[in-house]
Amino acid sequence: MSGRGAPATDGEHEDGTAGPRSRSDPAPAHRPERSPRRWSALVGVVAGLVLVAVAELASLAFGSSSAPFVAVGGGFVDVIPPAVKDLVIGLFGTWDKPILFASMFVVYALITAMIGQLASSRPVPAAAALGGLGLFAMAVVLTRAQNTPLDVLPTLLGTLVAVPTLLLLRRAVRGTTGAEPTASSEPTGAPDAAWLRRRSLVGVGLVGVLAVVVAAGARGVNAGRERARQVARFVLPAPRESAAPIPAGAQVDLTGMPPFVTPNDDFYRIDTALAVPNVDPGTWTLRIHGLVDEELELDFAALLEEPMTETHVTLTCVSNAVGGDLAGNATWLGVPVRTLLERAGVQDGADMVLSRSIDGFTASIPLEALTDSRDSLLAVGMNGQPLPAEHGYPVRMVVPGLYGYVSATKWLTELKVTRFADDTAYWTTRGWSERGPIKIASRIDVPRSFTELAPDSEGAVTLGGTAWAQQRGIAAVEVRIDDGDWREAELGADVSADTWTQW
């Protein structure tokens, strides 16, 4: 039974003591909500994605090399130690570039997440940090060989959009009002605030998803446009010297063997370009200079008027692991390099030709490999089609007998006749051999690794594979299982010393 006075309520007082509460007791203060750190981090990541998305979209007008992720990734590739590159290529093969982009995205997400957390309490320094990230990317864009000062505009535009986006999203997550609740505030307003918070977070998430879609779409359009540009670009000129017909016996009749001629879409790609360069054949030129009597400069139309040679050549990457697939055989069409060097007049004392790509890559090609009887080409065609963009369109080097790192320059723009003592190439400055002759190699293609064997009726399993030794050819292949005897394999028909042989 209660006396006259205020009705009592049970509960815990502000000071932590339990007991009945009367109207005279002060109501607990309603503390303002603060955005959790994880939501602040999300704001930073989304703002960073907006920067990339806008820059990728703008790069459609400037070319893929102006995109910040491509430029920064290319700069990273240029400075990492060669041993790390070897390890990455050995582990991931042709997946090396996607792995690099994924790793870059993780690092970028961590950096922008920290910027977002900083923005929750110090918005101005956070905005400056995000702007600094954009400035860093712009500086790297300027260092890329094929870029001009205008190529910073996509990243600049992305930064100008991302910084206010960061501040707007921060405000949305923290709430729509800046007034501090008082002791007299009605608790019924809390659900409305929570609902607004949830709506804001959903909006932040949608902005992030949209940014990812735009960035991925722009990157896909950039890549697809490069491939489409080379389709039906021109009609391949007829060769003056056609490649010898490939005999039927060159392809070993064994299920699971790769085709003797590697299709363009399956041909391995290893290079330092994270995005296929934009090369306009209408403005492309090749400069031949250095230790020559007469400097030459040819445009693409003039090059196509030169006598063409067609030949079968197997190319191999020096990073190809045992049993690896970083080797391919194709039929190439192009201009013999020696004819242009003879026209330029190579001076005494020269022993190397430094080939340069539009993206700045260089290769040190021994002069004799371009002037002897081998079919070293300025290739414009591959397997009866215009050279694919990812394989060097409009012009690339094909030099039989040398690993790609010293010969297979794609998107070629320059040949400098020089000396090994005077110039060094991209990979030789990183400790690699100057000359890079291909070593004899063989691999087992059938059965593939981890395949469940299916012996025939006599309990035998047939092995098949490929061997190559460019400029020398394959005379025999011997196979040994465990500690058994060496057994000579049956070879497919020989095509040339510059192509692989199936067995």
PLM features: residue spans?
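Actinobacteria-biased recognition of intrinsically disordered, low-complexity terminal regions
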Residues: 1-38, 180-190
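Juxtamembrane/transmembrane-helix boundary motifs in multi-pass membrane proteins
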Residues: 31-39, 96, 142, 146-150, ...
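Alpha-helical transmembrane segments of integral membrane proteins
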Residues: 35, 39, 43, 47, ...
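N-terminal signal-anchor transmembrane alpha helix
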Residues: 39-63
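Hydrophobic alpha-helical segments
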Residues: 52-55, 68-180
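Structured, non-membrane catalytic/scaffold regions adjacent to prosthetic-group chemistry
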Residues: 57, 61, 66, 99, ...
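N-terminal secretory signal peptides and thylakoid transit peptides that target proteins
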Residues: 186-208
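Extended acidic/polar, glycine-enriched regions
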Residues: 209-212, 219
